[in-house]
């Protein structure tokens, strides 16, 4: 197993994706004979151009759990449209008791966000954003709420298509 791991990690670096580990938890399974220790990892992967994915992995050892999480994150990537390194409009996401609010920011603002949200923004290529989390600070729920908000964001072209108008008509009023 140990000989195989460096090869897998080098393959992951060849595809040009950015990887960030958000959390590693030690978990315990209680059985008749005692306790079985393991590890659970939460990671995000992004291409720096709007594609981002989240993955969870569990294993008896930390590196194996992280590797499983990275592979799952690569499989579960979603595309979010960005505008000059930020999002198009204010958006809110919910998951469980976690609520995240995001707002676009002008160039030079940077990433103003805490904890797990910052990692998601960094790997997906957002350079300027203001984000705030309320409620639960559980990293799993915060990342899911962030993904909920990002997937619910729309471009002006999508809004215009839904309304049967042109983009110019939307901003004319």
Swiss-Prot record:
**Where does the S5 DRBM domain start and stop, copy by copy?**
17-80
Single GO term (MF): rRNA binding
Q: Is Ribonucleoprotein a UniProt keyword of this protein? A: yes
What is the role of the protein in this entry?
A: With S4 and S12 plays an important role in translational accuracy.
Quaternary data: Part of the 30S ribosomal subunit. Contacts proteins S4 and S8.
What's said on domains?
A: The N-terminal domain interacts with the head of the 30S subunit; the C-terminal domain interacts with the body and contacts protein S4. The interaction surface between S4 and S5 is involved in control of translational fidelity.
Q: Which GO terms describe its cellular component?
A: small ribosomal subunit
Write down what this protein is called. Small ribosomal subunit protein uS5
Give the InterPro entries listed for this entry.
Ribosomal_Su5_D2-typ_SF, Ribosomal_uS5, Ribosomal_uS5_bac-type, Ribosomal_uS5_C, Ribosomal_uS5_N, Ribosomal_uS5_N_CS, Ribsml_uS5_D2-typ_fold_subgr
PROSITE patterns listed in its UniProt record = RIBOSOMAL_S5 (PS00585), S5_DSRBD (PS50881)
Arranged from A to Z, the UniProt key words for this protein are: Ribonucleoprotein, Ribosomal protein, RNA-binding, rRNA-binding
What NCBIfam families is this protein classified in? rpsE_bact
């Amino acid at each position: 197993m140990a000989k195989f791991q460096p090869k897998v990690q080098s393959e992951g670096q060849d595809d040009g994706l950015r990887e960030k580990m958000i959390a590693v938890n030690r978990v315990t399974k209680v059985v008749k004979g005692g306790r079985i220790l393991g590890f659970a990892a939460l990671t995000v992967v992004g291409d720096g151009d709007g594609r981002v994915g989240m993955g969870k992995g569990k294993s008896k050892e930390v590196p194996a759990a992280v590797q499983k999480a990275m592979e799952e994150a690569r499989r579960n990537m979603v595309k979010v449209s960005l505008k000059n390194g930020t999002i198009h409009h204010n958006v809110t996401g919910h998951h469980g008791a976690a609520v995240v609010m995001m707002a676009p920011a002008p160039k030079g603002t940077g990433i103003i966000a805490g904890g797990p949200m910052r990692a998601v923004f960094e790997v997906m290529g957002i350079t300027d954003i203001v984000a705030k989390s309320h409620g639960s600070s559980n990293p799993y729920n915060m990342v899911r709420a962030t993904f909920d908000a990002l997937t619910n964001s729309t471009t002006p072209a999508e809004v215009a298509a839904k309304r049967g108008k042109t983009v110019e008509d939307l901003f004319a009023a």
